[in-house]
Amino acid sequence: MATTFEQMRANVGKLLRGIDRYNPENLATLERYVDTQARENAYDLEANLAVLKLYQFNLAYFQTTVTAQILLKALTNLPHTDFTLCKCMIDQTHQEERPIRQILYLGNLLETCHFQSFWASLEENRDLIDGITGFEESVRKFICHVVGITYQNIEYRLLAEMLGDPLDTQVKVWMNKYGWTENEDGQIFIHNQEESVKPKNIVEKIDFESVSSIMATSQ
């Protein structure tokens, strides 16, 4: 059985491909689509950017709640640059409003890898992620990505703090997911970074026509 998101995606896709892409009359449909993404833990960046673009063209239609949902969904797709793209489409005045200001701050903490500070700030603003299904799990996935490319070994306690101090069983779940192992000293072996460094051979193909044109211009 198709989810509401899947059912809406086809219709929204038609809207975005047609001449009505930036018709403000479509905002209600697109805003419902954003809410569906939040509830069903789904994601459609193109549609969300279209909403923000419509807000740029039609400031009177701006919806703070919808914009907050879009920003939070973009954070769930780190390390991709979606959050930066969305942020750049929001005017400075609206960036200073609650809850957008708080979400931008949380995003900055994540992008700069201040993970413990992120969880502390989120704890003070739990209402921000109400209705954003899977938000914390997506953030933890991003944090594990950063840990995986940064550390060879990490203390169990530090990893738990970076993941927001979940239950030990949850930390174990993330360790198992990425194949990380703990030794007797409480150190977790992440990855041998030296083994993952591989030289790249760069081969550039130049056809005869390109060479002949270069020779002709040099004569």
UniProtKB/Swiss-Prot annotation:
Annotated InterPro entries: ARM-type_fold, CSN8_PSD8_EIF3K, eIF3k, PCI_dom, Transl_init_fac_sub12_N_euk, WH-like_DNA-bd_sf, WH_DNA-bd_sf
Keywords recorded for this protein, A-Z: Cytoplasm, Initiation factor, Nucleus, Protein biosynthesis
Record's signal peptide: none
Any GO molecular function: translation initiation factor activity
Ranges where the PCI domain occurs: 43-205
Family indicated by similarity: Belongs to the eIF-3 subunit K family.
Primary role: Component of the eukaryotic translation initiation factor 3 (eIF-3) complex, which is involved in protein synthesis of a specialized repertoire of mRNAs and, together with other initiation factors, stimulates binding of mRNA and methionyl-tRNAi to the 40S ribosome. The eIF-3 complex specifically targets and initiates translation of a subset of mRNAs involved in cell proliferation.
Assembly mode: Component of the eukaryotic translation initiation factor 3 (eIF-3) complex, which is composed of 13 subunits: eif3a, eif3b, eif3c, eif3d, eif3e, eif3f, eif3g, eif3h, eif3i, eif3j, eif3k, eif3l and eif3m.
Protein name per the record: Eukaryotic translation initiation factor 3 subunit K
Organism of origin: Danio rerio (Zebrafish)
Phylogenetic classification of the source organism: Eukaryota, Metazoa, Chordata, Craniata, Vertebrata
Designated gene of the protein: eif3k
